[in-house]
Amino acid sequence: PSIRYHDNKFWVFFCTPKEGLFMSNAVNPSGPWSPLHLVKKVEKWEDPCPFWDEDGQAYLGRSRHGAGPIIIHKMSADGTRLLDEGMTVYTGPVAEGTKIFKKDGYYYLSIPEGGVGTGWQTILRSKNIYGPYEKKVVLEQGSTTINGPHQGAIVDTPDGQWAFFHFQHHHALGRVVHLQPMHWENDWPVIGVDFDRNGIGEPVYVCQKPIESKTIFAPQTDDDFSTPNLCLL
């Protein structure tokens, strides 16, 4: 799924293999959330990402099961309908998981390629949401033990800091979430640390948090099921 903040609401879009593309929104991320809305009944779509431009136009990026291609649709401003059949803007090796971001006139598509455990992170950029797009590999496993790195998204903070949110595949642990340091050079994101100076960043395990908090929360790790509510919630 993708979660975005627009028009004073949080929006979540996701696909299921056989049922289609769904949307829900909420003023508060803890809910209540609107009833699921079926945007389009369709099979084998995946990784949808909504995007609202400054001019009020709305779009949706997505891919297909089997990894790719990357397709952009025009979408109604209320997120309830797709307005066309979509345009393919990129085809690559196992290209999927697109996340759309705009900065300084550039549209950026963050896409993983090469497979969940063996791939890398690519950024596409263009002055037009339909392309043509320039391509740059911005993050790879390299000499680290953080494979993938997969399904990344650009994150900005209210005070102007930047970070990159992604996961790695870790067998029994599943998909382990990481937050990488990020800054901009020549209108390209620079992510992690370029240890071997090949122009491509590598993930790090330790970095300065973009937002500091002195409050430490320990996640719930067990439940004795003594009440009607789950402790994990």
Indicate residue ranges for each PLM-predicted region.
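Carbohydrate-active catalytic/glycan-binding domains of CAZyme proteins
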Residues: 1-233
